[in-house]
C-alpha cells in the first residue's frame, strides 16, 4: 500500500492531476503481474509439496507417530455446521474483533485514502513528496509495528493478542490526533510514522485473534467476517469523509475518525479477560453436538 501511494504521488507530480487515471491503471497492471505467481505457485496445504500435515509436525519438523485423532473429523455435516455456528456466528468475541477492526481500519484508510490530501492541502507539501512520506510511514512504521506487536503478544501477554491490539489502537488514535493538531512538517511526519506503527499491529493481529477464538476448524469463516468488516470501512472513509471534507473541510473529518478509534479501543477492551484461544470452548461444543 505504501509503495502504491509513492507511485501515485510520482505519477501526479510528473504527468499532472489530469492523468489521475494512471493512479488506477498502473497499480492494476502491476497487480496483474502477480497473478501467474499465485496461480502456479500458491498451494493449498503442505501435502501438495510433499510435506506432512501441520498437525502431525513436531519440534524440528519430526513426525508425531502418536498424534491424537482429529475430534472434528468424525462429525456429520450437520454437526460440523453447529460447531461453526457456535464458534463463529454465536461467538461474541468474533463480533467484537470485527467491530474493532472496522474502527481501526477507519483510521488506516483515512491515512491511505486522504493522507496525501492532508499533507498537500493542510501542510503545504508537494504531491510527490507527500506520497514518498506516506510510503515511508507505511513501510517503516508499519513493518516495525507488526513485528513488535507480534513479539509483545507472545512475550508479554501470553499469546493474548487482543490485549496488544487494545494498546495499539489507543496509541494509534492518539498519534493520529497529534498529527491533526501539529503544524510542524517534521512532527507531522513523526506522528504519521507512529500512527502506522500502531495501526499495523491490530491489522496483523486481528486475523490471529479471530483464528485463535474460532479455532483452526473455523478460521476461514472467522477471518472472513473480520475482513469484511475491515474493508467495509472504506464506505465511510471514501464516500462519507470525501463528502464531509468537501462540505466542511478536513477539520470536520478528523474528529469523526478519532471517535471511531476511541470506539475501537472500547470494543476490544470488552474482551480483555478473554482466553488466548477458543479450544476450551470448542471441547464443550463438541460434547454438546455429539
Language-model segments: which ranges?
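Glycine-rich segments within core transmembrane alpha-helices of 12-TM secondary carriers
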Residues: 1-8, 138-142, 227-237
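Helix-loop-helix hairpin linking two adjacent transmembrane segments in secondary transporters
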Residues: 1-45
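C-terminal membrane-cytosol helix-exit motif in multi-pass small-molecule transporters
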Residues: 29-60, 267-272
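Juxtamembrane intracellular "pre-TM" segments in multi-pass secondary transporters
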Residues: 50-96, 286-290
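Extracytoplasmic gate region of multi-pass secondary transporters
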Residues: 89-147, 203, 207, 237-238
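Cytoplasmic membrane-interface "Motif A"-like loop-to-helix N-cap segments
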Residues: 154-169
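C-terminal ends and interior cores of transmembrane alpha-helices
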Residues: 170-183
